[in-house]
């Protein structure tokens, strides 16, 4: 076989010439190993770097059911690029998945991440992964693996995308599916830390229209920091609450807001009637509504409006649940009740 012909004096090509820096990838792994190590918990078998990550389901479960979730951070990343602020989006990534699986009653066990970029910036990627590890610590799950994909030409320089994957476990007899929710039950609302990770396409449009000084003071911090506040993780206080009383249903308030997420846990024939005066609308949402001219109904179906998690309990358990969650550091309000659905009515109404 004849050797392939090449241009005279042409040098051989390397992967680096094609835009992929293997050495940078190795440097990133070295940087993030200490972050991942801090998240280790019972059940982790082996360390980062294997072809597959191993995890043994804790022996305390008699009939464990695995619960999985995956999500991203959405266009909040575009604001992170604009601000060159990458330290909080990792927690956002973890929160979006662990809060979702928590709703089924699951204890998060482990987490994996996917970081994709056009050109790998080791320091930026390490900052993001450090935030992911911090989110894992807050939720008690192990960061046991991930993928860093450097793909020249796929993303502009300085930009990246994230995806996260969480797996948890719940005792089969303790799965929370909303089937026991009944008329007269109480809807509790746990305060959000801010916008969380949904609605940022509208947020960015409002910023474009208002053209604010993002470095200006906004209630004790910069407007940029208020906008980028990481999604609150509710895992530990709610797992503790489940050990003390019957939690009938939960809804993670993400895309679709209160009016589209609470119905996901209600049986047909039941409606959650929410009182919008039962909790204060945080200043950031007031700012967004004012500068964007956003109608109330649109606010309720795009943003969390200050409520990051809804928890449904019996009326008899409501006060005890509020006391327990407050003692754990959460802000909680009775935001509504469950009643029979009226003809032609949605399953969540805000009055």
Swiss-Prot record:
GO terms for biological process: 'de novo' IMP biosynthetic process; adenine biosynthetic process. The lineage of its organism: Bacteria, Pseudomonadati, Pseudomonadota, Betaproteobacteria, Burkholderiales. This is Phosphoribosylformylglycinamidine cyclo-ligase. It is an enzyme of class 6 (ligase). The keyword Nucleotide-binding applies. NCBIfam families: purM. It comes from Burkholderia cenocepacia (strain ATCC BAA-245 / DSM 16553 / LMG 16656 / NCTC 13227 / J2315 / CF5610). Pathway: Purine metabolism; IMP biosynthesis via de novo pathway; 5-amino-1-(5-phospho-D-ribosyl)imidazole from N(2)-formyl-N(1)-(5-phospho-D-ribosyl)glycinamide: step 2/2. InterPro entries: PurM-like_C_dom (IPR010918), PurM-like_C_sf (IPR036676), PurM-like_N (IPR016188), PurM-like_N_sf (IPR036921), PurM_cligase (IPR004733). Belongs to the AIR synthase family. Its EC number is 6.3.3.1. One of its GO terms (molecular function) is phosphoribosylamine-glycine ligase activity. One of its GO terms (cellular component) is cytosol.
């Amino acid at each position: 076989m004849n050797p392939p012909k090449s241009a005279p004096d042409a040098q051989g090509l390397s992967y680096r010439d094609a835009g992929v820096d293997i050495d940078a990838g190795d440097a990133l792994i070295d940087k993030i190993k200490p972050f991942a190590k801090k998240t280790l918990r019972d059940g982790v078998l082996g360390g980062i770097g294997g072809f597959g990550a191993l995890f043994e389901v804790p022996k305390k479960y008699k009939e464990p059911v695995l619960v999985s979730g995956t999500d991203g951070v959405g266009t909040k990343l575009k604001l992170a690029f604009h601000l060159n602020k990458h330290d909080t989006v990792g927690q956002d990534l973890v929160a979006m998945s662990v809060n979702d699986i928590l709703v089924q009653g699951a204890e998060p066990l482990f987490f994996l991440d996917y970081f994709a970029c056009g050109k790998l910036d080791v320091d930026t990627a390490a900052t993001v992964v450090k935030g992911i590890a911090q989110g894992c610590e807050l939720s008690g799950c192990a960061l046991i693996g991930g993928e860093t994909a450097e793909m020249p030409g796929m993303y502009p320089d300085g930009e990246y995308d994230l995806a996260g994957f969480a797996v948890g476990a719940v005792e089969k007899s303790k799965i929370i599916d909303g089937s026991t929710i009944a008329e007269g039950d109480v809807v509790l609302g746990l305060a959000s830390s801010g916008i969380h990770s949904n609605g940022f396409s509208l947020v960015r449009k409002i910023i474009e229209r208002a053209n604010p000084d993002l470095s200006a003071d906004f209630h004790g911090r910069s407007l940029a920091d208020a906008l980028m506040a990481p999604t609150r993780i509710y895992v530990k206080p709610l797992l503790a609450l489940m050990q003390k009383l019957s939690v009938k249903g939960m809804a993670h308030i993400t895309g679709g807001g209160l009016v589209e997420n609470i119905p996901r846990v209600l049986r047909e024939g039941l409606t959650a009637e929410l009182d919008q005066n039962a909790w204060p609308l945080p200043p950031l949402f007031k700012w967004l509504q004012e500068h964007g001219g956003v109608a109330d109904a649109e606010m309720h179906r795009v943003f969390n409006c200050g409520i990051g998690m809804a928890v449904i309990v019996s009326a008899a358990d409501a006060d005890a649940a509020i006391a327990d969650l407050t003692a754990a550091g959460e802000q909680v309000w009775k935001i509504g009740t469950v009643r029979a659905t009226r003809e032609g009515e949605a399953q969540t109404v805000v009055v």
